C-alpha cells in the first residue's frame, strides 16, 4: 500500500514539474530582479561590513543569504566578487605577517611565548571576509549558502585563474569542514517510502548513470537493490552524497548485468554479494571534502 502511494506520488511530482528539471526563469522577470536587487545587495553588504552591533550584523547577514537564495546571477556575482576581494590580505596584514615571519621563537622558548606568537599569527591572517563569513554561515540557510558560494568561487577561480576567488574558496572550505561535523551527518536509506520530492531530486542529481524514467528509478530501488544518502540539517534535504547498491549472486562481470536492459534479479535470501556500483557527490561546493568516502565507510 505504501509503495503504491509512493509511486503514484512520485509520478505526480514528475508530471507537474517536468521530468527532471526546473522551469527556466522568465527573462523579463530575471531582468527586473537583477536591476532591483543589485543595488540592494551592495547596500546590505556595505552596511554589514560597517556595522559592529551584533544583532544588526545578524539581521543583515540573514538578508544577504536571502538575496543569494533568490538566484539572480548578477547579484550573486557581485556578492562573490565583494567577498573574494575581502578574502585577500591587505597591506597591514602583509606587514604583520612579514614581522611575524622574522620573529620565530628560539628553540626552547617558553610555551607562553610560542602560544602568544601563534595567537598573533592567527589574528594577522584573519581577513575582512572572515568575520562576514562567520555571520553568513550562522544565518538561517547559511550552510547551504556557504556550499553554493564555494561552488561559485571554485568555478571562477578555475575559469579566470582568479587569486581572490581561490582565497575565498579556502576560507569557505575551512568553515564547511567545521560545520559539516560527522556528528551532524545523517545516513538514510532511500526507498519507495522516501518522499517523492527527495527521490526526484536524487534522480535529477544522478549524472554518472542518468535515470530517464520512473521505471528506471523503480528498478534501482527494487528488493535486490538499495540506495543510501548522506544529509546535513543545514542543507534542508539536499543530499551530500549517495550510493547505489545491488545484491547479487557472485560478482557481475559487467555493469550491464545490474542496470542494463536485460539485468537480472536475485532473491535477497540467495544473494551473497553487495556491489557498490555507483557513488555520486553532487555538491560542487563540497569538492575535496571526502563525503563519498564517508558514505562507503558508513
Feature-to-residue mapping (PLM):
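Extended, composition-driven regions rather than compact fold-specific motifs
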Residues: 1-298
Amino acid at each position: 500500500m505504501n509503495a503504491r502511494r509512493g509511486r503514484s506520488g512520485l509520478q505526480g511530482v514528475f508530471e507537474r514539474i517536468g521530468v527532471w528539471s526546473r522551469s527556466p526563469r522568465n527573462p523579463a522577470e530575471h531582468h527586473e530582479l537583477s536591476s532591483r536587487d543589485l543595488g540592494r545587495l551592495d547596500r546590505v553588504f556595505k552596511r554589514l561590513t560597517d556595522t559592529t552591533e551584533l544583532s544588526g550584523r545578524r539581521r543583515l547577514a540573514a538578508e544577504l543569504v536571502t538575496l543569494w537564495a533568490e538566484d539572480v546571477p548578477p547579484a550573486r556575482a557581485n556578492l562573490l566578487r565583494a567577498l573574494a576581494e575581502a578574502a585577500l590580505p591587505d597591506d597591514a596584514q602583509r606587514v604583520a605577517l612579514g614581522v611575524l615571519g622574522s620573529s620565530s621563537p628560539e628553540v626552547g622558548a617558553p610555551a607562553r611565548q610560542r602560544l602568544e606568537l601563534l595567537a598573533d599569527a592567527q589574528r594577522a591572517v584573519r581577513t575582512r571576509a572572515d568575520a562576514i563569513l562567520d555571520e553568513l554561515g550562522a544565518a538561517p540557510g547559511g550552510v547551504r549558502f556557504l556550499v553554493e558560494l564555494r561552488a561559485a568561487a571554485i568555478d571562477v577561480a578555475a575559469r579566470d585563474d582568479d587569486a581572490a576567488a581561490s582565497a575565498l574558496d579556502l576560507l569557505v572550505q575551512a568553515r564547511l569542514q567545521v560545520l559539516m561535523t560527522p556528528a551532524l551527518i545523517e545516513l538514510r536509506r532511500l526507498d519507495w517510502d522516501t518522499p517523492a520530492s527527495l527521490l526526484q531530486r536524487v534522480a535529477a542529481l544522478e549524472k554518472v548513470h542518468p535515470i530517464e524514467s520512473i521505471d528506471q528509478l523503480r528498478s534501482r530501488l527494487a528488493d535486490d537493490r538499495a540506495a543510501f544518502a548522506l544529509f546535513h540539517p543545514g542543507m534542508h534535504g539536499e543530499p551530500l552524497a549517495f550510493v547505489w547498491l545491488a545484491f547479487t549472486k557472485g560478482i557481475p562481470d559487467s555493469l550491464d548485468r545490474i542496470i542494463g536492459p536485460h539485468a537480472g534479479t536475485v532473491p535477497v535470501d540467495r544473494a551473497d554479494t553487495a556491489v557498490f556500483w555507483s557513488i555520486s557527490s553532487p555538491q560542487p561546493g563540497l569538492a575535496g571534502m571526502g563525503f563519498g568516502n564517508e558514505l562507503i565507510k558508513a
